Amino acid sequence: MLSAGLGLLMLVAVVEFLIGLIGNGVLVVWSFREWIRKFSWSSYNLIILGLAGCRFVLQWLIILDLSLFPLFQSSRWLRYLSIFWVLVSQASLWFATFLSVFYCKKITTFDHPAYLWLKQRAYNLSLWCLLGYFIINLLLTVQIGLMFYHPPQGNSSIRYPFESWQYLYAFRLNSGSYLPLMVFLVSSGMLIVSLYTHHKKMKVHSAGRRDVRAKAHITALKSLGCFLLLHLVYIMASPFSIASKTYPPDLTSVFIWETLMAAYPSLHSLILIMGIPRVKQTCQKIXWKTVCARRCWGP
């Protein structure tokens, strides 16, 4: 018999799943359609496609874990699912980092030679970082996969549960998040500095004039700031979710922490949609037509 609290958590998890599924699905369809329409790879569309695609998969992984964990707590494939989860989560972070670098490249205006050099090579550097990430994490995945088949045989007087050391290796995989998070913070900091210097120039030279560049700065910072907040919640909730799954597992705690984690891929998709005028207008039209159709067919 489910408790009222657990039933409420399940309802919240389903709502978050539907929001993330629709939001990220809309972004994937839009970015792919833009690529088909223009017949050329736009950096922005490619980043949004990768980011939304990773979030779409991440949303499914969270709901699968919540659905299957109570039934198959000791299943070996669930452990592989947790490793794949870490890889997709890190890929999502890398694409969010590329988005912050893209904003920084398009919006900021600095005259320092080092910045100009990085600005010219930002796209190629990003591709090399992504390639290096996949190679390193592929090697780590193979290593951890071998560990699953050959658990460590240490001193018989000191034995750790299989689940505990498995999650320890999942934490090792998660260490790949440090580099993209640092790059994200640096590029976001450069956006803040650029906004501050631009604001000072505008106060001196063009007071009262509509400032399009400042608006672009603020829109980008809102998106990146919300991402950082949601990602920090995701990171802080992850260890508690893992701890809740160790023996004896606490199902209510698992739902609490993974519901908090699910807010990251679902809510940020809405923030991205609000920052893309064409997608926002399309979603508003669809929502308005849905409401009108419901009124026409309603009682």
Swiss-Prot record:
CDD domains: 7tm_TAS2R
Chain's role: Receptor that may play a role in the perception of bitterness and is gustducin-linked. May play a role in sensing the chemical composition of the gastrointestinal content. The activity of this receptor may stimulate alpha gustducin, mediate PLC-beta-2 activation and lead to the gating of TRPM5.
Family that this chain belongs to: Belongs to the G-protein coupled receptor T2R family.
Extracellular side: 1, 67-82, 149-175, 245-253
Entry keyword annotation includes Transmembrane: yes
GO cellular component, as recorded: membrane; plasma membrane
Transmembrane domains' residue ranges: 2-22, 46-66, 83-103, 128-148, 176-196, 224-244, 254-274
Segments on the Cytoplasmic face: 23-45, 104-127, 197-223, 275-299
Protein known as: Taste receptor type 2 member 5
Taxonomy, superkingdom: Eukaryota
InterPro entries: TAS2R
Parts forming coiled coils: none
Pfam families (alphabetical): TAS2R
Gene Ontology annotations of biological process type: detection of chemical stimulus involved in sensory perception of bitter taste
Compartment list: Membrane
Annotated glycosylation sites: N155
Keyword Transmembrane helix belongs to the record: yes
Sorted UniProt keywords: G-protein coupled receptor, Glycoprotein, Membrane, Receptor, Sensory transduction, Taste, Transducer, Transmembrane, Transmembrane helix
Molecular-function GO term, any one: bitter taste receptor activity
Other remarks in the entry: Most taste cells may be activated by a limited number of bitter compounds; individual taste cells can discriminate among bitter stimuli.
Membrane association type: Multi-pass membrane protein
